[in-house]
A protein has these predicted regions:
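Amphipathic alpha-helical segments enriched in hydrophobic/aromatic residues interleaved with Lys/Arg
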Residues: 2-20, 24, 139-154
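Feature targets compositionally biased, intrinsically disordered low-complexity regions
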Residues: 19, 24, 38, 51, ...
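Repeat-unit-sized solenoid/scaffold elements
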Residues: 23-31, 118-124, 154
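N-terminal short leaders/motifs
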Residues: 24-37, 80-85
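N-terminal regulatory/effector-sensing and dimerization cores
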Residues: 45-152
Length: 154
């Protein structure tokens, strides 16, 4: 899946009734949205780059929780980092609770995801980087990634 398709998924998600986001501005390669939730001042910025990377940043603060739903979203390879705050995710009948300092990786299609974003001490910040499997292989071939990352544990 190319970055344009992933970016279009973000546009569709932000515009959906269940996202909880209000679109602030949108171009062919940049999108900005604000949380609709009273008491929270969260913003999300998404950029699509011709290099094959899509970057999403969410930051802000306030009080309360921010529930959101994602019905279908496909990733090439995606890296998520919670910088501050917490995220409670329900995916495929399983629950995940990443918090500040945690990184998690996703690949492939996500269906019927519900998440609740929770600021810690009034703040929240998260990053999401989506890139192709080919880019991951290139980084590996260039020696940028440790070989141990690619060995399966037995």
């Amino acid at each position: 899946m190319n970055t344009a398709a992933i970016y279009r998924q973000y546009q569709t998600y932000v515009r959906s009734d269940k996202s909880g986001w209000a679109l602030d501005g949108c171009s062919d390669s940049a999108l900005m949205a604000q949380a609709k939730q009273p008491g929270l001042h969260l913003e999300m910025c998404i950029n699509r780059f011709d290099s094959g990377i899509t970057l999403s940043r969410m930051r802000g603060g306030g009080t309360g929780v921010f529930p959101t739903e994602i019905h279908n979203f496909s990733h090439n390879c995606a890296l998520f980092v919670m910088v501050s705050g917490q995220n409670q995710l329900q995916m495929g009948g399983r629950e995940y609770r990443p918090s500040a300092g945690e990184i998690w990786l996703v690949r492939g299609e996500l269906a019927d995801v519900s998440e609740t974003l929770l600021p810690d001490n009034g703040g929240m910040c998260a990053l999401h980087l989506d890139f192709s499997l080919e880019k991951l292989r290139r980084w590996h071939d260039e020696g940028l990634l440790d070989e141990r990352l690619f060995r399966r544990k037995r």
